[in-house]
Amino acid sequence: MGNAAAAKKGSEQESVKEFLAKAKEEFLKKWESPSQNTAQLDHFDRIKTLGTGSFGRVMLVKHKETGNHYAMKILDKQKVVKLKQIEHTLNEKRILQAVNFPFLVKLEFSFKDNSNLYMVMEYVPGGEMFSHLRRIGRFSEPHARFYAAQIVLTFEYLHSLDLIYRDLKPENLLIDQQGYIQVTDFGFAKRVKGRTWTLCGTPEYLAPEIILSKGYNKAVDWWALGVLIYEMAAGYPPFFADQPIQIYEKIVSGKVRFPSHFSSDLKDLLRNLLQVDLTKRFGNLKNGVNDIKNHKWFATTDWIAIYQRKVEAPFIPKFKGPGDTSNFDDYEEEEIRVSINEKCGKEFTEF
C-alpha cells in the first residue's frame, strides 16, 4: 500500500472511531431512559399476517391517521412467559428503541395491553433475503459481497455498543425498496460486556463455542457472518444435516468444504471467519473488524459509499406500492384477542 493510500485508510479509521463514539452517546441516552407506550392498538388497521412464531405474529398494519404502513410484531405475554422468553423480549424492545443505523429496521412505536406486547416497525416490502436466495439459487460473489458489507458495518456498529446480535440468518434480513438490507428480529440480541452463556440461535449458524457451552462473546456474530456469506454464495449453508446434533458435530469439527466456483479470496476470508480457534478468528483479533474490511475479498468495497447507500444495488425487489405484500408468504389469519383482565403485568412493567 502506498503512503497516500495508507494515510487515507488511517483517516477513514479515525473518522469511523469518531462516528461510533457519537453513536454510543445517542444509544446510551435512549438505553438509560427507554421510550414506553407511544401508541395503542386502535390507532392501526390490521391488514395481513406477514409471519408467525412460537409466541406471536407479525402483521402489516396501516396507521389510521397518517396512512403509513408498518409491520406490527404482536407477542402474547402468557406464551412469552411460558417459553421463558421474558428477558429476551425485554432486551429486544429496549435495544430496538435505542439503536439507529441505516441497515437496522426502525422501531416506530411500542405499547402493551392486558394480553399482548406490540412493537411497530418500519414495513420493508421486499421480503426476506431467504425467499430471494431460494428462488435465485445462489448469489454471485459481487451480489453476496454487497449484502455482506452491510452486515459487517452493522455488526461494527452493534459491537461498539456492546451488543451481540446472535441471530444472523437469511430469514432475518429484509430487502428494502432500494435493494439494501434491513436487519430485523432482535429477539436474541443482548447487551454484554465480556462473556455470556445462553444457548440460543439457529442450528446452522451457531458458533462452535456456543455449542460447546463455553462462555462466548461478539466473535459468534463474525462466525455467523462466515456462514451467511457461504450460504449466499453457495445456495446452501456450510454445515447441514437432517438432525441438529449432526450439524453440531460438523460445526465443531472445524472442517469446511467449498464449492469449486468459490474464488480463492472468498475461500480465504471464510477460512478466517469459520475459524474454530477464537484466537485466530477474524473480527476477534487486535485489529478487530479491520481485518475483515481490509481483506482482499472486500478490496473493491467502498465502505463509506455503502454506509451512505450510494452504491447501486445488484437487485431491486418487485413491488407494486406501499402496502404490497406479494414478497411475503400467506398465513392463516387469527383474531387478536385482548383479555378484560391484565395478564403478566409485573413481568413486563418495563416494556
Curated annotation (Swiss-Prot):
Residues 299-351 form the AGC-kinase C-terminal domain. Residues 44-298 form the Protein kinase domain. Belongs to the protein kinase superfamily. AGC Ser/Thr protein kinase family. cAMP subfamily. It is an enzyme of class 2 (transferase). Autophosphorylated. Phosphorylation is enhanced by vitamin K(2). Phosphorylated on threonine and serine residues. Phosphorylation on Thr-198 is required for full activity. Phosphorylated at Tyr-331 by activated receptor tyrosine kinases EGFR and PDGFR; this increases catalytic efficiency. When myristoylated, Ser-11 is autophosphorylated probably in conjunction with deamidation of Asn-3. A lipid is attached at residue 2 (N-myristoyl glycine). It is a lipid-anchor. ATP binds at residues 50-58, 73, 122-128, 169-172. The modification Phosphoserine is found at residues 11, 140, 339. It comes from the Eukaryota. The modification Phosphotyrosine is found at residue 331. The gene is PRKACA. The modification Deamidated asparagine is found at residue 3. It comes from Cricetulus griseus. CDD domains: STKc_PKA. This is cAMP-dependent protein kinase catalytic subunit alpha.
